[in-house]
Amino acid sequence: MSQSPKVGFVSLGCPKALVDSEQIITQLRAEGYEISGTYDGADLVVVNTCGFIDEAVQESLDAIGEALTENGKVIVTGCLGAKSSASGSNLIEEVHPKVLAVTGPHAVGEVMQAVHSHLPKPHDPFVDLVPAAGIKLTPRHYAYLKISEGCNHRCTFCIIPSMRGDLVSRPVAEVMLEAENLFKSGVKELLVISQDTSAYGVDVKYRTGFWNGKPIKTRMTDLVAALGELAAQYGAWVRLHYVYPYPSVDEVIPLMAEGPFKGHVLPYLDVPFQHAHPDVLKRMKRPANAEKVLERVQKWREICPDLTIRSTFIAGFPGETEAQFETLLDFIREAELDRVGCFAYSPVEGATANELDGALPDDVREERRARFMEVAEEVSARRMQRKVGKTLKVLIDEVGNEGGIGRTAADAPEIDGVVYVEPAAKASKRYKVGDFVSVKITGADGHDLWGEV
């Protein structure tokens, strides 16, 4: 019996890219290819790239170079595949002319076509061995659910639309079927992702779809309600990411706070505010201003007191004055956002922000980022201390000799904090990866918690 052809895989970038990788690997396995964990054990290598910021571009180019050196046969896909060099040619092909093929992001068909060209698929693949939920690169107890591709916004600092195109929403029945299959496979936490989760359905004018005979609009609020109902059947969590601050977000908060979905649609919002001063937001082509956002945050917390808000910001954007930056710091103090990240503005090739006046020196941008994070960490530490003494539901991610590591409803994997859980004193309280356990919080710092079952 001949050996199945083997494909190595390198996945870089954000959760959206990870989902693309999962879809490609699922198709490879469905067609009978094996996935190799090493370069030398693979017949060829697929590298899924990121091209959002300069550091990501360099990391991707380095990964391609390593794969070429170690294996020699490389197919490249992902956001960097859609990027041109200064001369107008494909950047990857210019830097690494020996790659076999290059595609853009979200291109399963093109990647498979390239694989077939250089490594013909085996006969009679055992397609029934591939689970309905697909191949996942995350641990078995959580998974990402991508509901749309692309973005209709044209933020001046971002080049994602030029790489991934305008918004294309997945049919609601298709999303629900994938969610059900994931829950059936044992997933305890579903992380809803896209470039713009709030815009789900805009491109199809909120068309009504059907799931199990029930009508569901292709709209964020309706989808979240349907996912919450499904999650409740399996005792699972649904977490929302990349929620652009549309007015429609206000409709989701009650689903987190009360009724049958409470505890399943997590009181957690990942909202990329980016800044707080209206003039800076205007230059970014972003909505809102600090006063309106503060009012909304306060209203959200009135409705849902347990709400956790995560956000990202940019310090040192072109034209940002010291006074405008101070407005941002004041906003962070007043809004008391739970989890924040901040980037010192970095020019991205192809972004229209590069044409704006008032570019700031590198040291000023970095100094403002550092000051921002000092304030943010003070706020986070205060909010974390309020959890000491409470008993919280924790999803266990790891178990070792010294206890477990898990996350509360306030913590998304990889980007937020964790809970360090003491070893169970009694056999009846022992836990394993993927279990939900009640943990009494005994300590906290600015990021993480400590507790006991």
Curated annotation (Swiss-Prot):
Sequence ranges assigned to domain TRAM in this UniProt record: 385-453
Main location: cytoplasm
Binding site for [4Fe-4S] cluster 1: C14, C50, C79
Chain ranges of the MTTase N-terminal domain: 5-120
Cofactor(s) listed: [4Fe-4S] cluster
SMART domains: Elp3
Cofactor note: Binds 2 [4Fe-4S] clusters. One cluster is coordinated with 3 cysteines and an exchangeable S-adenosyl-L-methionine.
Chain residues that bind [4Fe-4S] cluster 2: C151, C155, C158
UniProt enzyme class: transferase
GO biological process: tRNA modification
GO molecular function: 4 iron, 4 sulfur cluster binding; aspartic acid methylthiotransferase activity; metal ion binding; protein methylthiotransferase activity
UniProt family annotation: Belongs to the methylthiotransferase family. RimO subfamily.
PANTHER family tied to this protein: RIBOSOMAL PROTEIN S12 METHYLTHIOTRANSFERASE RIMO (PTHR43837), RIBOSOMAL PROTEIN US12 METHYLTHIOTRANSFERASE RIMO (PTHR43837:SF1)
Main function: Catalyzes the methylthiolation of an aspartic acid residue of ribosomal protein uS12.
Protein name: Ribosomal protein uS12 methylthiotransferase RimO
Gene that this polypeptide is encoded by: rimO
